[in-house]
């Protein structure tokens, strides 16, 4: 489950990476797209993301029945579930998960909930840092957490050379974090351009590697993007 209160920080991209890593090792994966404003995860056909309407039609009221149905599947089906979440539904979904004891129910069902949190660099650093602090403080110990540091918009480390992991914010929640995964900033005219092209086409890394739409060197760059991310993900999936 990918959570962040700010839009445009890479939540959907991260959800797609988690799904691809699981699919690559042959796991059964079910993707849920709960973002009512942007169906970005559904824009990647290979992931077969299913829409989950968090809100009642023409309303800001939560559709509890839809959430309960999603949770029922997560508790009873033998699969890995990847849930993408939009900024507008961040608060109500988080409230549902915490107040209704969903993490505890997942553990009782013999499974585990892993919450993937995003801290983005540049101008997004303060707000996403607060979001990380809020979720880490609210969610029960039964929910594991993975922290993603997204450097696409700028550095997440301090100007003094101190890493994000050395900050008081991270240290206060360190005991909750299974792993820290870094999305390094890509050169915009090479690696970044090839990745953007792949995402615009709605392809997975595997599909791009087989596609005739990409030059050989572009495929090589995409492999160089994917491999270190996949290697960081493997221990926590």
Regions found by a protein language model. Name each.
Residues 193-237:
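NTP-binding/hydrolysis catalytic cores, primarily Walker-type P-loop NTPases
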Residues 13-14:
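Hydrophobic positions on the alpha1 helix immediately C-terminal to the Walker A/P-loop
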Residues 1, 24, 28-90:
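Nucleotide-state-sensitive switch-loop elements of NTP-binding domains
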Residues 21:
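Rossmann-fold NAD(P)-dependent oxidoreductase module
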Residues 5-6:
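P-loop (Walker A) phosphate-binding loop of NTP-binding proteins
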């Amino acid at each position: 489950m990918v959570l962040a209160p700010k839009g445009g920080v890479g939540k959907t991209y991260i959800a797609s990476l988690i799904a691809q890593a699981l699919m690559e090792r042959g796991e059964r994966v079910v993707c849920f797209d709960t973002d009512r404003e942007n169906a970005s995860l559904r824009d990647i056909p290979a992931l077969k993301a299913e829409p989950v309407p968090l809100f009642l039609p023409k309303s800001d009221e939560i559709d509890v029945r839809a959430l309960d149905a999603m949770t029922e599947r997560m508790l009873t089906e033998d699969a890995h579930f990847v849930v993408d979440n939009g900024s507008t539904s961040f608060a109500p979904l988080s409230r549902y998960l915490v107040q209704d004891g969903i993490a505890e129910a997942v553990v009782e069902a013999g499974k585990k909930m892993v919450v993937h949190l995003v801290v983005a660099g540049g101008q997004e650093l303060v707000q996403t840092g607060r979001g990380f602090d809020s979720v880490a403080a609210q969610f029960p110990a039964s929910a594991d957490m993975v922290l993603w540091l997204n450097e696409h918009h700028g550095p997440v480390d301090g100007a003094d050379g101190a890493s994000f992991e050395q900050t008081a914010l991270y240290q206060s929640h360190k005991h909750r974090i299974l792993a820290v995964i870094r999305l390094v900033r890509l050169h915009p005219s090479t690696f970044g351009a090839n990745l953007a092209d792949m995402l615009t086409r709605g392809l997975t890394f595997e599909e791009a590697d087989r596609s005739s739409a990409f030059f050989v060197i572009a495929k090589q760059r995409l492999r160089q993007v994917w491999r270190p991310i996949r290697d960081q993900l493997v221990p926590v999936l």
